[in-house]
Regions:
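Generic structural signal for buried aliphatic residues
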Residues: 8-15, 62, 151, 179
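C-terminal cap/linker of serine protease catalytic domains
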Residues: 15-16, 21-23, 65, 69-125, ...
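Short, small/polar residue-rich loop motifs at catalytic or cofactor-binding pockets
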Residues: 54-58, 137-138, 177
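Conserved PDZ fold ligand-binding element
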Residues: 66-70, 140-163
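PDZ-domain C-terminal substructure recognizer with occasional recognition of PDZ-binding tails
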Residues: 103-109, 130, 143-146, 152-154, ...
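Short, well-ordered loop/turn sites that connect or cap secondary structure elements
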Residues: 2, 8-10, 63, 145, ...
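Active-site region of chymotrypsin-like
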Residues: 1, 26-87, 116, 124, ...
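Short glycine/Trp-rich loop-beta-loop segment that forms part of the substrate-binding cleft
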Residues: 2-25, 188
Length: 209
């Protein structure tokens, strides 16, 4: 059975069950349920944070104490939470998976309009958004964005957090939409227009005959 994340509470027990049966299961604790933004243009409105971490977290099923599946293991994290350094896992809540599950099983991806992808890996440091690297031949690199650029705004909309920045890009439309970006480069304010793309077009795919 799947259980919605609105029934998940911090400090609840969580059981990571990976391949290998009980010998590879781990009793863990839910630290919090919160938003997550990843530098690779990725945002979860809700993510399940657990600790201690499971060493084989990828694709592991996370059960609660009632035996319901509440999430799927996705990441290993090393972060500072409430002033303390902490290792743990991030799991995708099952209720976020359910609407796309049939498409994923049949096609490997949701059959919804692709979000605009700009190929820019961004980190949030000291309240600033900094370009840490670029996808080779990706839209941002082709537009002239450089590693170390500071993102100031999308059009006239100031960016505040990594999640806010990505959502602002996605709110412009689907893949192919132009993304007006203002950056700070060594004290100079510069404006660029990035022609976004569908990330899937840049992925290696199986060859068919």
């Amino acid at each position: 059975d799947l259980e919605k994340s609105n029934l998940i509470n911090p400090s609840d027990d969580a059981y990571f069950v990976s391949y290998g049966g009980l010998d590879h299961a781990l009793h863990s604790k839910i630290i919090r349920v919160d938003e997550f933004a990843g530098y690779w243009e990725y945002v979860l409105d809700q993510a399940i944070y657990t600790s201690p971490p499971h060493p084989q977290w990828g694709g592991a099923a996370i059960f609660n104490g009632r035996g319901h599946v509440i999430g799927i293991g996705s990441l290993f994290l090393h972060e500072v939470f409430e002033g303390q350094s902490q290792q743990g896992n991030l799991a995708i809540p099952t209720h976020l998976l359910e609407p796309a599950l049939n498409d994923l099983l049949e096609f490997g991806r949701p059959l919804t309009p692709a979000r605009p992808w700009i190929g820019m890996y961004t980190t949030e440091t000291g309240g600033e958004l900094i370009v840490s690297s670029l996808a080779r031949y990706g839209p941002a690199e082709l537009a002239g964005i450089l590693q170390g650029d500071q993102i100031m705004s999308i059009g006239e909309e100031k960016t505040s957090t990594l999640a806010h920045f990505f959502r602002s890009v996605w709110n412009l439309g689907s893949a192919g939409v132009s993304v007006p970006l203002q950056i700070n480069r060594e004290g100079n304010e510069l404006k660029f227009v990035i022609n976004s793309a569908d990330r899937n077009d840049f992925l290696l795919k199986p060859k068919t005959h």
